[in-house]
Amino acid sequence: MSFDPKGYVSFETALSAQGVLDDLIHAVKIATAGDDRVQLIPGVGRVEWVALPDDLLFGHVPGTSLDFPGMRIASPEKALCDLMWLCESRGFAVPWESLRLDDLDRGALEATASRMGLTIRT
């Protein structure tokens, strides 16, 4: 990707890229300390920046050569917790029925959820 995201790929985008979410994704969602915004990026498409509190911006690793090279991407457990936080804070439901949770690291998921003040209800 040829832009500076000022954050890391997360939410449904990271979950889909890592095989945890079955749904087709129509935008790249990026967790950021900046403001919420949406932009069409040539060669990328729709990019949505979602503001998270600074203390919740953790748990990301370098993207692979196939998925988001040169960018940071949330671990599957962090992406799920970011999505849970977003749904809880904005008043919509987590798409539990579309998630494949069996391969997630349960310990990492619970630790991340605890650090973010979330409760896992799966």
Write out the residue ranges for each language-model feature.
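Short gly/ser-rich loop at a beta-strand->alpha-helix junction or flexible surface loop bordering the NTP-binding
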Residues: 1-61
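Hydrophobic alpha-helical interaction segments
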Residues: 58-122
